[in-house]
Amino acid sequence: MKTAIFGFAGSGKTELFQALAGPGSEHNDRAMVKVPEPRLTPLVDLFKPKKVTPTEIEYLDLPGGSTKGEGLGQRVLNAVRPYDCLLAVLDHFSGLSDPDSQHRSIETDMIIADLAVVEKRLERIAQDKRKAKNLVDPKEESLLEQVQAVLEDEKPLRGDPDLSSRPELRGFCFLSAKPILYIWNVTEDNLEAEVTAEHAGEAHLAICAKLERELAEIEDPDEQQAFLEDLGIQASALKVIISKAYELLDLITFLTAGEKEVRAWAIPKG
């Protein structure tokens, strides 16, 4: 699973990336992170395999977008297209910007970018139709017109899963169709902050990236747990974000075991 982490300049996205990637990530923008899976341990004890392979998530820390209110910028929008899941970090700690407005700005940027892709393709189809009708796939044209209607209504495509999941549209890599997890980066004394109601294909979490980075620097698991308990946090951001990402992508973990290898696989639910 490939997840892109992005946000406006000063949102704290790099601090969150470092919390997820762990110690030694200060000079990197890409990390492979093992998915915690406690069910592997008894299987390893039973089979004593030569190899143990947990599931991994690739995180990419993208360059910061423009200043809040000026949009993400084309560079960021282009960079997130190949990724399976998006993780957008919203500033809810500085008091300089409203997270709801940041959320709306990100959604608007993605919708506009998708609309440009659709309009360009429909223009090409119209040109081909003028040359010869047999050059045009009427099914593709109809689907793109449906996509265009949703986007012109200023709605993200993920809100229409029946349309956005059509295999004929997969090659377009529409941004607003991608599952997205919004992280409200809060202060230490605002961990219980209320976040925006979730919409189809998106989720919202309140997390203090600064605290989570400090937690990631603690190597001893018992000390990590004591740190969480002192703060009244049930689970680390690493576990919570992975769990939410699996929900958004509709994935489950499947285990296989034998003397050669015990392995965890991320597979579609059902």
Language model segments and positions:
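Conserved G1/Walker A P-loop phosphate-binding module
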Residues: 1-94
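Conserved Switch II/interswitch segment of TRAFAC-class P-loop GTPases
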Residues: 31-36, 63-70, 81-140, 150-162, ...
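Short, low-complexity, polar/charged sequence segments that are solvent-exposed and flexible
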Residues: 50-52, 76-80, 105-108, 200-203, ...
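Short, exposed beta-strand "edge-strand" segments with a Pro/Gly-rich flavor and a Y/T-containing core
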Residues: 53-54, 96, 213-218
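Glycine-rich loops and low-complexity Gly/Arg-rich segments
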Residues: 57-59, 83-84, 112, 228-233
